[in-house]
Amino acid sequence: MTRLRTAIEAATATLAAAGVATPRIDAELLAAHSLGVDRGRLMFVDDPDPEALAAFEHLVAARAKRIPLQHLVGTAAFGPLTLEVGPGVFIPRPETESLLEWAVAQQLPRDAVIVDLCTGTGALALALAQHRPQARVIAVEDSPAALEYARCNAAGTSVEVLAADVTAPDLLPELDGAVDLVVSNPPYIPEGAELDPEVADHDPAHALFGGPDGMAVIRPIVALAARWLRDGGKCAVEHDDTTSARTVEAFTHDGNFTDVTARHDLTGRPRFVTATRIARS
């Protein structure tokens, strides 16, 4: 067994003992990061230099303390993107890619206006901009730390990153009736929910919690979408897996939407709700 293989086996055992959900995958990704190679190339590395091995062991020790893998390597994958992440910004989750797939499948004008509310790293906005290069894509975020990451990730793209609070009354009235698609992965976890250490200790609370019932940001987003969307425009909002019915009710109670649909992610859990703006009378 090579030195690297031995080190990865030891790291896997360490991470498993620490309660990491995917110890082997994390060990291999940390090894690849330390060596500066793709994970698939690890099998071709026989004898890593001592500095790389020491760096790997340092990262494993940090991961065993439940520091997020993405913070340790500095990036997170989302759809077609690799995004810069770190302390102060919510790490994009694979579950949100189900919402992305739905959004990509929508029939929109070539020059559509798309708004991503609570953009965080810019994940949804940037992925949609890549799929729809002719669209105007606006990413809205109110956290200064998250805005830094969003602007960094959006550098060199056409995505417009705006600093604004999505719960503020009369936000951006110039968009009233002009938006084709609104998407959002907002703070939605009900206060008091039990979370893994990676989330509770390292994701910003501002990006996680949506008030006592998880709906404190979702309800204003529904009202905002009703104002911004053109007739027939589409909206998709992610929610906690315990609040699907509440999110459906928020759209239904607003009275400006039809085709309100609860949707699931790839694991089969309730994940987001979609709706269509009804025509104005």
Curated annotation (Swiss-Prot):
Residues that, per the record, bind S-adenosyl-L-methionine = E141, N185
Catalytic reactions of this protein: L-glutaminyl-[peptide chain release factor] + S-adenosyl-L-methionine = N(5)-methyl-L-glutaminyl-[peptide chain release factor] + S-adenosyl-L-homocysteine + H(+)
Q: What class of enzyme is it?
A: transferase
What this protein is called in its record is: Release factor glutamine methyltransferase
InterPro entries per the UniProt record, alphabetical: DNA_methylase_N6_adenine_CS (IPR002052), HemK-like (IPR004556), N5-glutamine_MTase (IPR050320), PrmC_N (IPR040758), RF_methyltr_PrmC (IPR019874), SAM-dependent_MTases_sf (IPR029063), Small_mtfrase_dom (IPR007848)
The record's GO molecular-function terms, alphabetically, read:
nucleic acid binding; protein-(glutamine-N5) methyltransferase activity; protein-glutamine N-methyltransferase activity
Binding-site residues, substrate: N185, P186, P187, Y188
Function text: Methylates the class 1 translation termination release factors RF1/PrfA and RF2/PrfB on the glutamine residue of the universally conserved GGQ motif.
Q: Which organism is it from?
A: Mycolicibacterium smegmatis (strain ATCC 700084 / mc(2)155) (Mycobacterium smegmatis)
- One Pfam match, given by its short name, reads MTS
Concerning CDD domains, the annotation shows:
AdoMet_MTases
The gene designation is prmC
User: What GO terms describe the biological role, i.e. biological process, of this protein?
Assistant: methylation
EC number(s) of the enzyme? 2.1.1.297
Could you list this entry's UniProt keywords, alphabetically sorted. Answer: Methyltransferase, S-adenosyl-L-methionine, Transferase
Stated family: Belongs to the protein N5-glutamine methyltransferase family. PrmC subfamily.
